[in-house]
Structure formats: C-alpha cells, structure tokens
Amino acid sequence: MPHQQMLILFGLLPVATNISTWWNFGSMLLTCSALQVMTGFFLSMHYTANINLAFSSIIHITRDVPHGWMMQNLHAIGASMFFICIYMHIARGLYYGSYLNKETWLSGTTLLIMLMATAFFGYVLPWGQMSFWAATVITNLLTAVPYLGTTMTTWLWGGFAINDPTLTRFFALHFILPFGIISMSSVHIMLLHEDGSANPLGTNSDIDKIPFHPYHTYKDLLVISMMIITVLLTVSFFPDIMNDPENFSKANPLVTPQHIKPEWYFLFAYGILRSIPNKLGGALALVMSIMILLTMPFTHTSTLRSMTFRPLMQFMFWTLVATFTVITWTATKPVEPPFTTISQVASIIYFMFFMSNPILGWMENKITKHN
C-alpha cells in the first residue's frame, strides 16, 4: 500500500489505457464536492438558522452580500450537477460491472446515501413553502416504523411539529455531513486503488497500463472544464431553472401547496414511494430503491464482467434508464390516473432490473457456452 500511495503522490499510478470518458465522472464529483464546500462555507457566514430569519437571510445573501447571488446559485446548481454526475457514475458502474469491486461499490453506495441526506437537509434550509412541506412529508415517513415511529419522529423534529429546533439541527447536519462525505470519498478512492479500475471490455488491465499523469489528468481537466462552463452558464442565464415556484414564498404551516415534491434528483425515489398506496410499504420501497444497489455484487452470475458483450443485460439496463426517467416525470404529476398506474408499472420494472440480474447472467452463460 505505501508503494501505491507514492505512485499516486507523483501521479504515476498505473491506469488502463482503454478507459473511456465514462470514467471521468469520479474527478468531476471531486470538483463538485470542492465547489459545494467552498460556496457552502461562504453562505453559512450569512445564513441564520431561525424560522423567522432564514428566508430573509437568503434574500439578504442574494441582494446585499457582494457576489452572494452567485454563491447561492452556484451552491444550488452545483447540487444538481453533483447528482447528474453521481447518477452517471453509478450507471457506468452498473453497465461495466464496476460493482464486482465489492468494497469500492459498497463504500460508493454509502456515499450516495450520505449525499442524499445532505441534499435533503440543505433543501429545508431556505424555509420556503416547498422546503417546509417536503421536510414535513419526508420526515413523517418515520411514523410508519412500527412501535418506535412516533418517538423517532418527535426526536428528529425536536418537538411535536417541524419548528425552530428542526431547522437548527438540519443546518448543523447539513454543515457536518459534507466532512463525512469527504472522509468517505478518501476511503472510496483508497479501496478503488487496491484493485484498480475496471475497463469497457471488462478484462484484466494489468497487461496494458499507462501513468495517470499526464494522460488521464488532461483527460479529466477537459471534462471538468466543460462541467464548470455548463454550471457557470446555467448560473448566469437560468439560475432558477431547478427551483420550485412555491419556494419563493415563506414557509406557512397553515397553507399546503397543491403539489408537494422534493428536488428533481429525489423524484425517482419519491415516485416509487407515491406509487404504493400504503405508508409503510411506500417507505420501505423508498429505502429499497437505493439499498437494492448493494445487492449487485452478490447477484452477478455471468462469466463476463461488462455488459459490452451481454445483449440481454444491455436491454435491461436501457430499460432501467428509461424507467428512471419515467418515474422522475410521473413524480412531478398529480396523484391521479393515468400517472399512478404509469409510476406503479415503472416501479415494478425498476426493481425487475436488479431481480433479473442473476437469471439473465445464468441464461447468457448457457447461450455462450461452447461444447
């Protein structure tokens, strides 16, 4: 291990020659992480975690603080970019069999859960209408836990309803969790370099490797530059493209928005939750929609690592991508036919991808077996 650390330090880490642009998302995520920590740090200097002042402090940041509007928009758009990159990163891992590197995959799934928790706490902080009601709906799911549910919810809220203590602790959690993400990212990278990256062919890369620097550093810099330009263009010309109009109104516990929904990057999980007409069942499906990723290394039965030469699994993968998009779309719609039916069918297909993984692997082995 010390030898590998020295190689990383001098940029001489041996990396497969044939890894494609799909392997660039790791460095893009690192850039997003740095951007979020920096902008978040400056925003926290001017933010006030109090239900009477939080909304006003956001207005103060955007209007009165020098470049505050840029910091606030960079932080909001940066979060969306973070999730775009992480979903692409996970899709790459699923397609090219990166999940067979078990420890790396399990640490990565833990990172995803931590990131989703951080983003959820952050969405509550502006104390707008959608912030308040999204927090109410999601935290209320804890009450579905038998016996302990109500006690856990009261403990999380710091009272009998979402109030000042809730906002204060959500701000504290939103501030501390990114440091956990950074620590876990270091573990993720160290575990990755134990065995090295996979490659598009799913073969052993040991026979054909090149130094990480300068080849992959320049390749990374190109996509990082493209990502930063995209973020800056969005911040400059479409800063509110991801915002919900409801969130421009201060939180009012007496007025319920017509359609409560979280940020776009949670819509697929929220859509799965809504598709089940039972509180506990929906909450379990919500948790399982993320946790099912943990099963992938243990259900792989194919002799081939990558999906490059697995047509049946390729079909299921692209069905999963389409399903993910459909669930995200239906979650933005009212809870009424045909949207409920569409999201129920799409949710079943979503879980079918993971359940069919061992069966399709076994079938492909039978088809490709040479006598």
From Swiss-Prot:
It is a multi-pass membrane protein. One of its GO terms (molecular function) is ubiquinol-cytochrome-c reductase activity. It is found in: Mitochondrion inner membrane. It comes from Candoia carinata. The keyword Iron applies. One of its GO terms (cellular component) is respiratory chain complex III. One of its GO terms (biological process) is mitochondrial electron transport, ubiquinol to cytochrome c. SUPFAM superfamilies: a domain/subunit of cytochrome bc1 complex (Ubiquinol-cytochrome c reductase) (SSF81648), Transmembrane di-heme cytochromes (SSF81342). The cytochrome bc1 complex contains 3 respiratory subunits (MT-CYB, CYC1 and UQCRFS1), 2 core proteins (UQCRC1 and UQCRC2) and probably 6 low-molecular weight proteins. Belongs to the cytochrome b family. Its cofactor is heme b. The gene is MT-CYB. Heme b b566 binds at residues 89, 188. This is Cytochrome b. Heme 1 (or BL or b562) is low-potential and absorbs at about 562 nm, and heme 2 (or BH or b566) is high-potential and absorbs at about 566 nm. Component of the ubiquinol-cytochrome c reductase complex (complex III or cytochrome b-c1 complex) that is part of the mitochondrial respiratory chain. The b-c1 complex mediates electron transfer from ubiquinol to cytochrome c. Contributes to the generation of a proton gradient across the mitochondrial membrane that is then used for ATP synthesis. The chain crosses the membrane at residues 25-45, 69-90, 105-125, 170-190, 218-238, 280-300, 312-332, 339-358. The lineage of its organism: Eukaryota, Metazoa, Chordata, Craniata, Vertebrata. Pfam families: Cytochrom_B_C, Cytochrome_B.
